[in-house]
Amino acid sequence: MAQLETDLKSNNETTQVESERVLSFEFRGDGAEYFKIWIVNIFLTLITLGIYSAWATVRNNRYFYGNTFVDGTSFSYLAKPLQILKGRIIAVVVFALFVGLAGAFPIAGAILYLVLGFAAPYIYNQSLAFKMRNTSYKNIQFRFNGDYGEAFGVLVIWPFLGLISLGLLYPLALLKMHQYRMNQTAYGTTQFVFSAQVKSYYKIFGIGVGILLGILVLAMLVLNGSGLMSPNGAAVLAGFVAYIFVVTYFTVAFTNLVFISTSLKEHGFNATLTLRGYVKVVLINMLLIVITLGLYLPAAKVRIMKYITSCIELHERGSLDDFIAAEKESVSALGEQLGDVFDFSV
């Protein structure tokens, strides 16, 4: 009997493994092809005094979304240029009013900035709602169902607590931000679920601090010992090098953690970025951008996108086609425009 139960359990596990399909993300863009889009966007934006920037944004997004594939199907970017242009016009007007009032009437300006601070969570929510509902995969749109109170917490309260705790609560603040964004996002009618634990965030921050201190000490010893730089110059260079490595480590570690900790119903994700692989791509990009006086920038964006997508997988258990597209949410036009203009992207 025990043997029979063991065999049945083994068969069930085998069936479960066989029913899972690992789908790799793939970016099929080309650096030379994107360069043509990039250079035309810059030229037209300049000669139209910035008006074409809305069309440039749409062209860029449609290129990158349309060249990102999963299971043979690409993503789609649905936003229209005029939606973005209206938002940017409103943003310029609001910004000009703020600057003008702050200069002429400092007290009134301070009050308006305070109002903007309280409006930021609303703008953030509307911005993400706009971006998500203008992103689709297999003709099913994404959604973002934001809550003002939660947004205020992750944008204002938790960062403030991180500040007054001298950074000790920053890992928890970042966890709250990731939880809010992922748990409020849906594909069709199905919500994403984010299950990362706070200890993972503290572990990453701890390693990051260790890398920072280690590089600072090593760089200072090498630079001071060589006699090529003054102590102040050595400190500045060491700080710059340490900053680059720590930011790179955080990018790799948190990208992996967010994907691994995110699920969509029974479907899961995996990310396997490595510090070595990412640093290699970043250093090559920086070198070629400097050598080409910035002309390699479009190809650099394509190169980093290719690397990141090549390290991301969707573990499909069942069929994604079973998801039902949610009805389009009626997002306030003013909220969309302000959010798009102020570009509250994470």
Which residue stretches match the model-derived regions?
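Pore-lining and gate-forming transmembrane alpha-helices of multi-pass membrane transport proteins
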Residues: I37, Y113, I204-G208, N232-I244, ...
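Hydrophobic alpha-helical transmembrane segments of multi-pass integral membrane proteins
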Residues: L44, L85-V99, L116-I123, I157-G162, ...
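Selective recognition of hydrophobic, aromatic-rich stretches within alpha-helical transmembrane segments
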Residues: L46-N60, F105-N134, L163-Q184, M229-V258, ...
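Hydrophobic alpha-helical segments of membrane proteins
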Residues: F205-L221, Y249-L257, L283, V290-I291, ...
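Membrane-interface extramembranous regions at the lipid-water interface
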Residues: Q3-V40, W55-I90, N125-L155, A173-G208, ...
